[in-house]
């Protein structure tokens, strides 16, 4: 099975606090993987490293590879990092859309990397690009909102627009950081259904950070759980039982309670 993401000996320190400890991870083509863990476990930090949004410590031997290209090595971004990012869709918890633009215009932003610079200066997109953007919106059930400002949409609708933008980008990997954290249950279900549909029918690899264990178990065949910056569990979601759940979350809660009591 083809390895799409390879992480070796990744460490990260923030203000003398080590957020990641020599993390090793391989993710294969077509997988839908949930990164789980309590707040502060390092899951979002790990996800940001995968696309080079942040760099790791200058650790000997640390290396991240995405789609066969080096993203960063020993704390330094690769010179051709843009080539890796060109095929990586990143979905943020807070949507990261341009409120003053329409839904369609926001989706077209996904084509900027493949559009000549002079065209991007004037937002001149081709008819073919606009058609692809409409197809992406149809895919996520948002085509009827194409000419509406994104500022008028609900959180769940905005998240689906962000997914359509990743499709417009022709992403081979989607990295989603807490995409349902601020959504109501029905909106969260629709967003996760959309990500799973893209994964299963398009073969796009999806890595998603989640707080909600039930969604991870329902939508992702594989779980990578982090605890205090270490990989605590990496395996089938079916094998992530109550005992592992308790050890991952409740032991952390006890540490926090003891710290408050002290």
Curated annotation (Swiss-Prot):
SUPFAM superfamilies in alphabetical order: P-loop containing nucleoside triphosphate hydrolases (SSF52540)
Domain ABC transporter: 5-253
Main location: membrane
Membrane topology: Peripheral membrane protein
Record's keyword terms, sorted: ATP-binding, Cell inner membrane, Cell membrane, Membrane, Nucleotide-binding, Phosphonate transport, Translocase, Transport
GO cellular component labels: plasma membrane
UniProt key word Transferase: no
First-tier enzyme category under EC: translocase
Location within or outside the cell: Cell inner membrane
PROSITE patterns reported for this sequence: ABC_TRANSPORTER_1, ABC_TRANSPORTER_2, PHNC
Top-level taxonomic group: Bacteria
EC numbers on record: 7.3.2.2
Catalysed reactions, as listed in the record: phosphonate(out) + ATP + H2O = phosphonate(in) + ADP + phosphate + H(+)
Binding site for ATP: 37-44
GO molecular function, one term: ATP binding
Pfam families with a match to the protein in the record: ABC_tran (PF00005)
Family indicated by similarity: Belongs to the ABC transporter superfamily. Phosphonates importer (TC 3.A.1.9.1) family.
Note: Phosphonates utilization is cryptic in strain K12.
Its biological purpose: Part of the ABC transporter complex PhnCDE involved in phosphonates, phosphate esters, phosphite and phosphate import. Responsible for energy coupling to the transport system.
Assembly notes: The complex is composed of two ATP-binding proteins (PhnC), two transmembrane proteins (PhnE) and a solute-binding protein (PhnD).
Protein name as it appears in the record: Phosphonates import ATP-binding protein PhnC
Organism taxonomic ancestry: Bacteria, Pseudomonadati, Pseudomonadota, Gammaproteobacteria, Enterobacterales
């Amino acid at each position: 099975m083809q390895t799409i993401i390879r992480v070796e000996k990744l460490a990260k320190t923030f203000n003398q606090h080590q957020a990641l400890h020599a993390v090793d991870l391989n993710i294969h083509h077509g997988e839908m993987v949930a990164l789980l863990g309590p707040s502060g476990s390092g899951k979002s930090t790990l996800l940001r490293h995968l696309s080079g949004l942040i760099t790791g410590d200058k650790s000997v031997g640390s290396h991240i590879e995405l789609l066969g290209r080096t993203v960063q090595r020993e704390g330094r971004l690769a010179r051709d990092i843009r080539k890796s990012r060109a095929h990586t869709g990143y979905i943020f918890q807070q949507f990261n859309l341009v409120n003053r633009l329409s839904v369609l215009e926001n989706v077209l932003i996904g084509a900027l990397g493949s559009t000549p610079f002079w065209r991007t200066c004037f937002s001149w997109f081709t008819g073919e690009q606009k058609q692809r953007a409409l197809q992406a919106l149809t895919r996520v059930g948002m085509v009827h909102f194409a000419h509406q400002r994104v500022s008028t949409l609900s959180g769940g609708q905005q998240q689906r627009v962000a997914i359509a933008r990743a499709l417009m980008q022709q992403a081979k990997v989607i990295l989603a950081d807490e995409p349902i954290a601020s959504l109501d249950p029905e909106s969260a279900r629709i967003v996760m259904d959309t990500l799973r549909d893209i994964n299963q029918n398009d073969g796009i690899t999806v890595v998603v950070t989640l707080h909600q264990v039930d969604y991870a178990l329902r939508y992702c065949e594989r779980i990578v759980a982090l605890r205090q910056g270490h990989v605590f569990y990496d395996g089938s979601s079916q094998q992530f039982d109550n005992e592992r759940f308790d050890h991952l979350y409740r032991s952390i809660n006890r540490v926090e309670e003891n710290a408050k009591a002290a």
